Amino acid sequence: SEVITEQFARIAKKEVHLEVEEVGGPLGYRTRFTAVTTRDGALGFRQARSNKVVPVSDCRILQPELKYQELSNRKWKGDLQVEVSISSTGERTIATGYTRDETPVRTSEGPDIARYAVNEFPLEVSQRSFWQSHKEAPRVLTEAVLKFAQVKSGDHLLDLYGGVGLFTSQFLELVGESGRVDLVEGSKSATGDALRNFA
């Protein structure tokens, strides 16, 4: 809640008070992360509000299946961005790219497309597409949206900033044959994933 309160104060010049509901425990919840390497190839994370890379040998907020300790023991090339994710099926993807240029990261290990299931609806997510990093977030967010949206058969919905189709996947069955869901997304990668997810 401190981050949100700070952003409202800094950007919107408004004072807000929030109550944040904790979802799951404080450790082992992240399914994806972006790390960087030092010039010498040590894996770590950027210091807050800085470009300084702090080598880290373990990160307890990550799901154990990401095997961060094993990754931190590798000898990496210097000045790399390392993006790692784990799917619902347990497949780990590692994508790398150099931090000193604008070249997009490329998958170096694992599948190019991760598979997730939210309330039994399968979704495919490319490495470049956004996906929630907290393992419970997709479920919790869809439950909250469904509770407040009160979607009925025959409704016409707009899923703005719809990404790969997290909310659309839940809305389709509710609106039924007489309804419609239009997903709007600007990311080429996420749009491609959404087209594949709803083909």
What are the language-model segments listed below?
Residues 1-199:
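Accessory RNA-recognition modules of RNA-modification enzymes
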